[in-house]
Amino acid sequence: MAEIRSRQLDFSEESQEERRRYLRSKPVPLVRNGAGDLWMVDRHHRLRALLELDSRVSTYGYVIAEVESHDRSDVLRELQRRGWLYLHDGRGKGPCPPEQLPSSLLDLEDDPYRSLVWKLKKEGVLRPQPLIPYHEFRWGAWLRSRPLPPFHSGFLDPALPAARRLARSAAASHLAGWKGEA
């Protein structure tokens, strides 16, 4: 939720024209099924932030793949096959069956480790990887397996020093976006 709250602050300070320009520069990658339904592959946090501010918001997108089937299960299987689903809950438990994914962005669970990774990216500890969906969650899962002091998405400070050290360590070198020592 840390990224969502930060983006909401940014969006609330922008004019409608500034917001439109920003959204045009960050289109949402989509998968379209045979019925014409669209599935988001990335930008979930950004759009959730906007939806919470304005439930009628619209954005720009582009289709990166098409799945002929009309069946939701077939589409979910294809997304999973391509690595375009993250099937863990906010506590890192999973994988859960794809059919249990929420159908609304507003129903996605908070993952404090994903928030921690967002903060590390924002600080420049991690390199952005726009072509690798869900790499932030992979980082979060990795950090979750390491000892960190108690924290939550609204209060990341206790975990940041240890998370920075871990993210720069050689043990993290297999993760997309790793930069190593500063």
Language-model features, listed with the residues they occupy:
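Surface-exposed, charge/polar-rich loops and edge strands
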Residues: 1-21, 25-37, 51-182
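Short hydrophobic beta-strand that contains or immediately precedes a catalytic carboxylate
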Residues: 39-42
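Active-site-adjacent structural elements in enzyme catalytic domains
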Residues: 44-46
